[in-house]
């Protein structure tokens, strides 16, 4: 089977790390062992520097909304061109913690950046490059934030007010409904239920890929 790019998406506290581990388990059960891992923003030395600037700013100066968008896309294209595409070309599968859908939801939804502008920027920077499968872990923002707070100190994005995350979730759900490559998983269930749902979704998708 040709190598694929699989992405885990969702709000803070949705359980992306656990989901990633579950996806990897299923891939290995299907004989897929050459797997590269990425995270966004970040994933390369340059992109990690941009991640730190995005998260913390410099000497109290935080990026404006438009600067935030451009920093995210700079980090993303660096990761895609230097890590993801080369990995896929050599036959490895790539499992990513976030990708472009995050920007479309957080900046296009949460921040209120013009959605046509966001789509245009995506197409200009990434061309036709898209994940083969995206698992969107959906849960009420208040639940995710409670989980995030329980983990410890919150970053700049995690400290946003609840309405920001409600707008972000609404955009996530809107985009997921429009794209057959995005599978929505109810992440408000118990850990065992979420894990079982992810295993089922990924296994069914792999069977479809094998039969294609």
UniProtKB/Swiss-Prot annotation:
GO MF, one annotated term: ATP binding
One GO CC term, this protein: cytosol
Reaction it catalyzes: dTMP + ATP = dTDP + ADP
Entry annotated with the keyword Protease: no
One Pfam family linked to the record: Thymidylate_kin
Coiled-coil parts of chain: none
Keywords, comma-separated and alphabetical: ATP-binding, Kinase, Nucleotide biosynthesis, Nucleotide-binding, Transferase
Keyword check for GTP-binding: no
Residues reported in the UniProt entry to bind ATP: 10-17
EC number(s) recorded for this UniProt protein: 2.7.4.9
GO biological process: dTDP biosynthetic process; dTTP biosynthetic process; dUDP biosynthetic process
Alphabetized HAMAP family for the sequence: Thymidylate_kinase
Family: Belongs to the thymidylate kinase family.
Function noted in UniProt: Phosphorylation of dTMP to form dTDP in both de novo and salvage pathways of dTTP synthesis.
NCBIfam families in UniProt: DTMP_kinase
Protein name: Thymidylate kinase
UniProt gene name: tmk
């Amino acid at each position: 089977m040709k190598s694929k790019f699989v992405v885990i998406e969702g709000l803070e506290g949705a359980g992306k790390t656990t989901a990633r581990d579950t996806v990897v388990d299923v891939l290995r059960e299907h004989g897929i062992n050459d797997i590269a891992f990425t995270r966004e923003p970040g994933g390369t030395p340059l992109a990690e520097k941009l991640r730190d600037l995005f998260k913390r700013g410099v000497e109290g100066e935080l990026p404006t909304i438009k600067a935030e968008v451009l920093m995210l896309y700079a980090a993303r294209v660096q990761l895609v061109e230097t890590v993801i595409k080369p990995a896929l070309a050599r036959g490895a599968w790539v499992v990513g913690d976030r990708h472009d859908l995050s920007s479309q939801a957080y900046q296009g939804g949460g921040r209120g950046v013009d959605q046509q502008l966001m789509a245009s920027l995506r197409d200009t920077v990434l061309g036709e490059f898209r994940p083969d499968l995206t698992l969107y872990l959906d849960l009420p923002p208040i639940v995710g934030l409670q989980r995030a707070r329980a983990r410890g100190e919150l970053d700049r994005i995690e400290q946003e007010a609840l309405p920001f995350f409600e707008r972000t979730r609404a955009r996530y759900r809107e985009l997921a409904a429009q794209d057959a490559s995005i599978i929505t998983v109810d992440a408000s269930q118990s850990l065992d239920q979420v894990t079982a749902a992810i295993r089922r979704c990924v296994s069914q998708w792999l069977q479809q890929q094998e039969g294609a």
